[in-house]
Amino acid sequence: MPTQQTVTAPSLENRLITLQHNSSVLANNPLGDPSQRPVNVYLPKAYYDRRRKNRRFAVLYSLAGFTGAGPGQLNWKGFEENLVERLERLITSKQMAPTIVVFPDCFTAFGGT
């Protein structure tokens, strides 16, 4: 008889926050696309290290492909890492420097970004 195993998602050691951006460019646009957009931002654990207040970080803007949206890049994946999990692994294993990653929602009524 097979044994039952408990599977838990990896813990998110770093931070993922959501900001709201009000775009004056999209205000009153003819397609009726919302001008207020969520912007997810990944902040590495080192960002909160108070001993290094003046530290600077590289910033990457992760733009989703056509018909994709920023929030979709954060989705759970059953058999592989999502983007945040990959960032966690690469930063923790020192294969990547601590980096801020911005995931803007650029989806439009045309279905693209």
Where are these regions (language model features)?
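Non-catalytic cap/lid and distal C-terminal segments of serine-dependent acyl enzymes
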Residues: 1-113
